[in-house]
Regions:
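Structured C-terminal cap/extension of enzyme domains
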Residues: 36, 40, 203-379
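Active-site beta-loop-alpha junctions enriched in small/polar residues
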Residues: 12-14, 47, 74-78, 129-134, ...
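Conserved, mostly hydrophobic/aromatic
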Residues: 9, 42, 57, 71, ...
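Short, flexible, mixed-charge acidic loops at enzyme active sites
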Residues: 22-23, 82-91, 226-233
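Short, well-ordered coil/turn segments that N-cap beta-strands
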Residues: 2-7, 38-41, 65-69, 121-125, ...
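Acidic (Asp/Glu)-rich catalytic clusters
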Residues: 1-4, 58-70, 116-120, 144-151, ...
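N-terminal binding-site loop/beta-alpha segment at the start of enzyme catalytic domains
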Residues: 1-73, 77-79, 363, 367-379
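Glycine/proline-rich, positively charged
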Residues: 18-24, 34, 88-191
């Protein structure tokens, strides 16, 4: 097993499998993902490109000694039997329209084995449950199935990756309380301009000895410093779903952060990574490398990420000052369990029950204060 390093790249970089920036040629993305030159941890999910991202990463890994890289995989969306629902993507494998609990173990084993086959490796260093629904967070059957693939050597450690949108705070904490003895990793959204709600689950991660991977560290590409007011986004770019004015507001806050970065000889992206890593349970950051039209090359961004110091340079007062500048509390409607959900549960949103209300009390979270959209979205 090779433990994930402090910086990593995911197969969603380069715009081929998720719509961020210009899609790069497959050969270029393979070169970007090939371990070496300061980056040896790679993340993938089997649903990206319905397995194509796995296959491309497998080509990037060809000929590299297995001991020289760490692979974090993710399973959860059933693209084998499930039908894609437009922008919502493929259903979770726990969707009752696809199968019941008696078939969860078979699916988890199949999905894990096929992903490994596409990658050309024997085992994941970390295997994440990808974007679970309420069942995924709470079902002993699901986690027994994950335990089985770990115990059989198909994965060295397990974790949970909420998403795709922001939220799921109480669900992640509840999952750690239920299955903490199985869970070594969690992946959450966190960056200096989005400290909320990700920071709310970090104390529980620390308590349960769970290491955290943070994604969206680049804040939609802004910390790469080539997204400015008037930026030309492609018609299908995911960032078009962000609130109007997010670029302008973000750039204003970025400029307030720049002196802190310069004080330590860091780029804005390296500052964002350092800020995340300064939170005790955070062990790995995985920003998205985006090829902006007319912007810096993703190869240049990779080199910048690789040069991020592992040693934490920021002091506590700087971490707090950065948080205050980027404070986004209440700026968006969150996914997962929330006090403002009405009606039946959906795959990515549901109401609070007594157990989750008790979880909130234990961790000092007031749902009406901490998990509601309170202000107009800033992006």
């Amino acid at each position: 097993m090779r433990r994930p390093s402090h910086t990593a790249i995911g197969t969603w970089s380069g715009g081929r499998y998720l719509h961020f920036g210009e899609p790069v040629a497959p050969e270029r993305l393979e070169a970007l993902l090939r371990p070496g030159d300061g980056i040896d941890t790679l993340l993938t999910a089997d649903a990206y490109g319905s397995g194509q991202a796995d296959e491309l990463l497998g080509r990037a890994l060809a000929g590299v000694e297995r001991a020289d890289f760490s692979i974090v995989g993710a399973i959860g969306h059933d693209f084998y039997v499930g039908q894609r629902d437009g922008p919502r993507g493929f259903p979770r494998f726990t969707d009752p329209a696809l199968r019941g609990p008696d078939a969860y173990a078979e699916y988890v084993r199949m999905a894990t084995e096929r992903s490994l086959e596409r990658l050309g490796i024997d085992a994941f260093d970390v295997l994440l449950l990808h974007n679970p629904d309420r069942t995924g967070y709470t079902s002993e059957v699901v986690w027994d199935a994950l335990r089985a693939v770990r115990d059989e050597g198909l994965a060295h450690s397990l974790g949970v990756a909420p998403g795709p949108a922001n939220g799921f705070t109480l669900d992640v904490i509840d999952c750690l309380e239920r299955f903490g003895e199985l869970i070594d990793w969690a992946m959450v959204i966190l960056n200096p301009l989005e400290p909320w709600p990700g920071e709310l689950c970090l104390a529980a991660a620390r308590e349960h000895d769970v290491d955290v991977i943070t994604r969206v560290v680049d804040y939609g590409g802004m910390f790469w410093d080539d997204v400015r007011p008037g930026h030309d986004f492609a018609p299908k770019d995911h960032r078009l779903f962000r609130a109007k004015g997010w670029v302008e507001a973000g750039v204003q806050r970025l400029e307030r952060l720049r002196p802190i970065a310069e004080r330590h000889g860091l780029t804005p992206m390296q500052l964002a990574a350092q800020w995340c890593l300064a939170h005790e349970p955070v062990a790995c950051v995985v920003p998205t490398l985006i090829q902006e039209p007319g912007g810096r090359s993703i190869e240049d961004k990779r080199a910048e990420l690789a040069a991020t110091p592992a040693e934490i340079l920021l002091v506590a007062d700087e971490v707090a000052a950065i948080r205050a500048i980027g404070d986004n509390t209440g700026s968006m409607a969150l996914k997962g369990a929330g006090p403002d959900h009405e009606g039946d549960a959906r795959p990515d949103r549901w109401g609070l029950d007594e157990r989750l209300e008790e979880v909130a009390r234990r961790w000092g979270i007031e749902p009406e204060r901490d998990l509601r959209q309170l202000t107009a979205a800033r992006g």
